């Protein structure tokens, strides 16, 4: 029986991916480069180190990826400081509140950093529901490695078989599946690959669509 629900953050709870993409495009343009949607899709859900490898392969070995990341984060900071909004994905806040009312433990397993994770959850008014928050600051091996989910289960005192995962990215879903958890996928930018399609428990268009399956999800 499921006792804990673990959510990804970017692209699953919050509609941050489109903002990150705009910030990457601005940062790349400053360097005379074009950051394509295809390249961004390849970087979604993976670690900064792995993303840097892809970016360097795309632009060439001399491309200053560290500066690109620094400028991207600077643009993101500016967006927030100027009052830019971080919107929930459809049904996300309601899903967190629903599972909390059902008496389940709620946790976050994100590839983002702790500072941003706590900021978004706080601003969104849902941090109070979370019993555990695990980010890239807490693990050595990023998604698609299952470490972030295994660490989260340990924090919750739950067996992996008792955990229900919601993810949007291929890397994140692969991590949840590889951890041995019941993993549901709600794609935003990139559709699931064959591994995720074959091993995901459910695939939804939106978190608004999960309720008819609730008995099956929590069994």
PLM feature spans:
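Metal-dependent phosphoesterase signature
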Residues: 34, 56-97, 102
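Asp-based, Mg2+/Mn2+-dependent phosphohydrolase catalytic module
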Residues: 1-3, 97-100, 113-219
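Alpha-helical substrate-recognition element adjacent to the catalytic core
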Residues: 27-59, 65
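Short helix-capping segments at alpha-helix termini
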Residues: 30-33, 59-63, 102, 125-129, ...
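Active-site neighborhood of HAD-like aspartate-dependent phosphohydrolases
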Residues: 1-42
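Hydrophobic alpha-helical core bundles mediating ligand binding, dimerization, or RNAP-core interactions
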Residues: 24, 28, 48-55, 69-80, ...
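Conserved SAM-binding loop
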Residues: 13, 88, 106-109, 141, ...
